[in-house]
């Protein structure tokens, strides 16, 4: 709470999950899928052994509840690539977040810190503020850039954040607390695309996943089994010539499937976007290009503080593969293959264990530090007087 007794909450609305809680806390109070489910015509009368009539299915279900009953629901995701695509559904998610089932707060007596990816469309930000003040009537609000929050959580003020969540990956250099928007790179490949690609690879093996609920099933399987190959050619030989990589996985309906080379082939799309028909460089080359585009004086500082953040950086093998590829690019393009000079090149990739929640943790730190600084927050009164011009306050603070 701030000095006037108002609640201060942080809400990190990701494409895949909502992470929300109070300022100053070490982890989110609630984490739940950012999904809305509507019942299909229920031709199926049983799920497993449970009679459907025993289950209470509302007209509309959100978050955990929608996830648990997903085989009965048509599931939709209000956000795509970090941008809200369906505002009505997004409001259902927020109703659920602020309502009795989760945060259970009175918005009129609450300050809220929201997050957004760098390079997000202004329209998205404007609509978000409008909804917060007009629909919910929050006392004050602030919108922070996710990459900067990640660095706060890591206790740094300069570095490069590679943030890969469910909907978008971005590489954002930050120098002395300022995000450098002209150097920020965005890659529209993230967790959801890798899940889609895994579904496609499994289809080629003869396993069909075509119901909207299966998407969630494959996502959970991906998190258990996928990894990033250090040496792709070697991994491919292992997959073709041996059964070392094969793992059995039991689906919720009891079927057992065998997964082999798909375990590293699916997340490989992060490094080779052409695998899923996306043009452009992969995550390692993008990080290298970003740092090389920065001022020569700050490059060493950036190479030494590459911080991973977001659920899609949790694959085993990702940090070592990133380091290897960036070193290789530096050797070829900067040192012109002079291997003796490579010893002087310092690179460090930080992979904090709690990186799934890094953005929230940084937000909780920022909200706690600024909770009594009225000049920091956009108040409802300012919004009523100035309308969307109030957003200019953000620019003054963050740049």
UniProtKB/Swiss-Prot annotation:
Species of origin reads Drosophila melanogaster
| SMART domains to which the protein is assigned, alphabetical | ACTIN
Q: Which InterPro entries match?
A: Actin (IPR004000), Actin/actin-like_CS (IPR020902), ATPase_NBD (IPR043129)
Q: Is ATP-binding one of the keywords?
A: yes
Where along this sequence does the record place binding of ATP? Answer: 165-167, 219-223, 310-315
List the SUPFAM superfamilies.
Answer: Actin-like ATPase domain
Q: Subunit notes for this chain?
A: Component of the Arp2/3 complex.
What molecular functions are annotated in GO for this chain?
actin binding; ATP binding; structural constituent of cytoskeleton
Designated name of the protein: Actin-related protein 2
Q: What is its biological role?
A: Functions as ATP-binding component of the Arp2/3 complex which is involved in regulation of actin polymerization and together with an activating nucleation-promoting factor (NPF) mediates the formation of branched actin networks. Seems to contact the pointed end of the daughter actin filament.
Tell me the GO BP annotations in alphabetical order.
actin filament organization; Arp2/3 complex-mediated actin nucleation; lamellipodium assembly; positive regulation of synaptic assembly at neuromuscular junction; regulation of filopodium assembly; terminal button organization; wound healing, spreading of epidermal cells
Per the record, the similarity remark reads: Belongs to the actin family. ARP2 subfamily.
Query: Among its keywords, does the record have Cytoplasm?
Result: yes
Q: Where does this chain mainly localize? A: cytoplasm
For this UniProt record, give its keywords in alphabetical order, as a comma-separated list.
Actin-binding, ATP-binding, Cytoplasm, Cytoskeleton, Nucleotide-binding
Q: Name one GO cellular component term.
A: Arp2/3 protein complex
Q: Which Pfam families match?
A: Actin (PF00022)
Under the heading PROSITE patterns, the entry gives: ACTINS_ACT_LIKE
Subcellular location per UniProt equals: Cytoplasm, Cytoskeleton
Q: What lineage does UniProt assign to this protein's organism?
A: Eukaryota, Metazoa, Ecdysozoa, Arthropoda, Hexapoda
Gene3D superfamilies, A to Z: 3.30.420.40, Actin, Chain A, domain 4 (3.90.640.10)
- Tell me the name of the encoding gene: Arp2
